């Protein structure tokens, strides 16, 4: 098991690819910091991950488009897990409409979540990665 005992941070962990990555990492023995902007879904993670020990993971509310939120999550992961080995930047959103119908403000939010968040994640996670 290549990730056994490693600490991973997964953004967008409450659904889609993030949830699938979380389950795979837990299956392989990693300890996982699950982050998502959706507080309600995060509160269901204990039920959704009931086949895993709750000591294997911890959830964090996280707006990946916010630099301050990244700083807070990274600080908490370092306190709660002691280190970080793996970063999975899987949070993402879509336009929800065709480009002609999309307001520019919506496009900027998509850009912040899908691109800027990867920069922020790498910027703040890298210094504590072992």
Where are the language model's segments positioned?
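Canonical Rossmann dinucleotide-binding motif of NAD(H)/NADP(H)-dependent dehydrogenases/reductases
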Residues: 2-33
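Conserved glycine-rich Rossmann-like NAD(P)H-binding loop of the short-chain dehydrogenase/reductase
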Residues: 28-45
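The beta1-alpha1 cofactor-binding region of Rossmann-like NAD(H)/NADP(H)-dependent oxidoreductases
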Residues: 39-40, 61-72, 104
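A glycine-rich helix->loop->beta "capping" turn
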Residues: 52-56, 76-89, 95
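Substrate-binding pocket helix/loop in short-chain dehydrogenase/reductase
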Residues: 98-99, 106-111
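A short, exposed helix-loop element centered on a Lys and neighboring polar residues
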Residues: 122-123
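Helix-to-beta-strand junctions that scaffold the AdoMet/dcAdoMet cofactor pocket
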Residues: 129-130
